[in-house]
Amino acid sequence: MSWLLTRFMLCALILIAQIIGKPDLAPSAWVRRLVTLFDRAPATPFDTVQLVLKKELGQSVGEIFENFEAEPLGSASIAQVHRARLKGDKSDVVVKVQHPGIQELMMTDIRNLQAFALYMQKTDIKFDLYSVTKEIEKQIGYEFDFVREANAMERIRRFLYENNKKSPVLVPRVLKDMVTRRVLVMEYIDGIPILNLGDEIAKRGINPGSKIAMTAKQNILKSMTLAYGQMILKSGFFHADPHPGNILICKGSEVALLDYGQVKDLPDSLRLGYANLVLAMADNDPIRVSESYRELGIDTLSKCENELQELLKFAQTLFDTKLPPGVVMLQPFSEDSLIKKIAVQAFPEELFSVLRTVHLLRGLSVGLGINYSCAEQWRPIAEEALYLAGRLKGTDLKPRVRKCRLFRRLLGRE
């Protein structure tokens, strides 16, 4: 059982890596090392995997699969995935298998994280970190139920495919009769991990700064941004874990989004409140930012003279992919840190998933070498969401949003 002991020691490290292993939160040298942990956790031995599959699916590996690769494609903190092919089928599938005993280990790590959060709140960092760890506890708790994950994957797949002529991202199809709490079988999507994109570009002899390379990167970011704008602002139900290990780049710069263990279903009040904050950030409107904070239930206490401008800067630091002028990296311990200037006394637990998602998108944009504002890109979706909720008049919409609505009416879609 030495593999289980090794896993116990590494679980906390992997959690930390996935939280801070982004270019805007840590030096690049750290990031290069931390991101390797996204899908390289210790693997469960194959004989144990076979026992889990037999118990969960009721048949042995040989009875179900034509072939089954013993070496996993990747192993993360909760599960590992294997490539396989079902008997009588010509298409490959991915089999996700939960590590035995991992739930108890992970929840122990979370409790330790909560104790650390309570300690940190006694320092100069006046941020409601404990609420954040409570949301992490809830979200990670959901990840141990693969039936829930399969339902989430199907719901998001249906939403994106039905609301777009072509879905901005690929979502694997679930094999519904091969899902249990600990095993999930889904469609195999061929692609390269986004972490290997730079190597793939170099292998093809393409200059990373060339027009063709930058166009490919822009298309990748455009796809991710559109998908997340629609999920968060239009649906409220979204994939909440877009770290590099969950993103594949497919033929033609198409993007596949994997692993739906962490999803979030925002209540309409928070979805529309965040839509209002998106418009405030896109317009650099400090008064609207302050109003949005109150609507979202973010309780702040400012320790600076220029309160409204600092609140705007704080919002853009937390909830936009483009950092405001003068902010290069989040540095909570520096003397001029925004977290020290603005004490966050209350922060809605459910909003943490939005914050984390935006920060992961920011890390993606920095890694691709593209500085952009998701708030500006999401403006049309936010305006439409508020309009449909009766909170904006047609005359308040930007011209491109009015034009999109006109097209939908002509096509009979509303």
Label each PLM-derived region with a short phrase.
Residues 281-285:
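Short helix-adjacent coil turns
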Residues 245-249:
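Hydrophobic residue at the +6 position relative to the catalytic HRD Asp in the kinase catalytic loop
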